[in-house]
């Protein structure tokens, strides 16, 4: 497939930036927080600053804090970034996600809107009904600490094969290389 360019223009569109602002600040708890109150009071300036940073390719996730959560019986260490940075990351990843989704095979389901476990289950059931002998056995597995084991260089190779916009690739590299090894859990880019 061809590499995609001119993505920055899509990212900095006012509609995309506005949607990202609303998505990050959804819910009354976030709006009442100190960061949320500041962002709401200075919305035009914040969006203007983020648009300028993204358009010039200088946006970087500056700082994060780690938090441990228990989800599904597993202990996970996630990285939490400030809301202002989260708006920019969301704006970038919304457009990147739209371009990547076209390249996924139909049975890719994890973390994809209007797909997921039940959508994939329908495919598995259909395949089992159509070919009972070929689907008699299955192998159930779980990759332990998957995001921590992903090779950053391989992800960068994949990103550079899809996108040719150098500014975008540089910003995505800053998301990918945020952690010493593996991918960050908590950034939208890990989904």
Set out the residue ranges of the language-model regions.
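Conserved polymerase palm-domain catalytic core
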Residues: 127-191
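Non-catalytic, polymerase-adjacent accessory regions of viral genome-replication enzymes
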Residues: 1-48
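Active-site-flanking structural segment that lines cofactor/substrate pockets
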Residues: 43-74
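Generic hydrophobic/packing signal
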Residues: 54, 58, 71-73, 84, ...
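Short, conserved non-catalytic motifs in the polymerase core
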Residues: 29-37, 62-89, 103-115, 175-191
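Non-catalytic, well-ordered alpha-helical scaffold segments
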Residues: 2-5, 18, 44, 48, ...
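Active-site-proximal segment of RNA-dependent polymerases
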Residues: 3-8, 89, 93-141, 145-148
């Amino acid at each position: 497939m061809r590499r995609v360019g001119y993505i920055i223009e899509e990212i900095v569109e006012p509609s995309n930036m506005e949607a990202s602002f609303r998505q990050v600040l959804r819910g009354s708890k976030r709006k009442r927080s100190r960061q949320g109150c500041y962002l709401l009071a200075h919305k035009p300036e914040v969006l203007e600053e983020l648009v300028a940073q993204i358009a010039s390719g200088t946006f970087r996730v500056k700082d994060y804090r780690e938090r441990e959560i228990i989800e599904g019986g597993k202990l996970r260490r996630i990285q939490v970034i400030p809301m202002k940075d989260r708006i920019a990351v969301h704006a970038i990843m919304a457009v990147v996600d739209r371009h990547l989704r076209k390249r996924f095979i139909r049975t890719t389901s994890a973390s994809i809107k209007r797909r997921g476990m039940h959508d994939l289950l329908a495919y598995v059931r259909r395949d089992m009904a159509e070919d009972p002998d070929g689907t008699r056995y299955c192998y159930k597995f779980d990759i332990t600490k998957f995001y921590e084991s992903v090779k950053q260089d391989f992800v960068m190779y994949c990103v550079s094969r899809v996108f040719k916009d150098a500014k975008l690739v540089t910003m995505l590299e800053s998301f990918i290389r945020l952690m010493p090894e593996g991918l960050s859990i908590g950034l939208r880019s890990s989904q």
